[in-house]
Amino acid sequence: MSKLPGEDTLLEVNIDDIRVSPFQPRRIFFEEDLKELILSIKAVGLIHPPVVREIRNGDKVLYYELIAGERRWRALQSAGYKTIPVVLKQVLADDLAAEATLIENIQRVNLNPLEMAEAFRRLIVVFGLTQDKVAKKVGKKRSTVANYLRLFSLSNEIQEKINSGELTLGHAKVILSLEDESLRQILSEKIISSKLAVREAEIEAKRLLKGKEDASKKEASLQKTSCLVSYQERLATTFGYPVTVKPQGKRICVSFFVEGEEALESLEKALTAGSFEVTV
């Protein structure tokens, strides 16, 4: 059967002659998922064969590099299949093959959030695409691409929980709403231990944030009170009279307590003459 130049070809190849593309974004494959896929393939056949390209040395084919379908290939390989049907892409340049691998997997494969983020990052870093161009190529909103890329600002520990499936993308977005790293860690642990839904995680995030704000206000109040007490003690030492220093709105009220007009007159002279020094 003849084919046109550049036309894709369906052929059967040795399963061990296939290699994974270095640009494959997916890194985690769960054994249970592969077993389910094998059962499906045995029941209805391989409906969508993996897509590959030839890697050659002159006229000799060294191996076939996967562009899409690694999960299907791994499933059949683990099931002991010796050959596999594939769709051969004709003469695809390295850069185009790499870009096609990333885009194909983003569009068709159930990547976890961090694998998706890594695919977006590679399109940006390796191929110099903007977030807008990436969004157009993969059929997503620019804000979606940006949200995925924000996952890299999370701690390694939280990223591992996303990779393992303990935290979803929705959970990650809630965690990212907290700027404080310690609060992020507390929230992530709470989500996992209490099996919180995203909405419940949002409520918990607000509670944690309010608690931190209340604690900050209390700390500021304590610091202010400590400062005023210090002034109060120094003023009492300087003038020799009992003193209170209290906040009144944005102002500070300083009250001296003196006994008799003579003491009051003495205090007045000291204040108006400016002949005093408050030791700091």
UniProtKB/Swiss-Prot annotation:
GO terms for biological process: chromosome segregation; positive regulation of sporulation resulting in formation of a cellular spore. Pfam families: HTH_ParB, ParBc. Disulfide bonds: none annotated. The keyword Ubl conjugation does not apply. SMART domains: ParB (SM00470). GO terms for molecular function: DNA binding. GO terms for cellular component: chromosome. InterPro entries: Chromosome_partition/occlusion, HTH_ParB/Spo0J, ParB/RepB/Spo0J, ParB/Sulfiredoxin_dom, ParB/Sulfiredoxin_sf. Transmembrane segments: none annotated. Keywords: Chromosome partition, DNA-binding. It comes from the Bacteria. Involved in chromosome partition. Localize to both poles of the predivisional cell following completion of DNA replication. Binds to the DNA origin of replication. Belongs to the ParB family. This is Probable chromosome-partitioning protein ParB. It comes from Chlamydia muridarum (strain MoPn / Nigg).
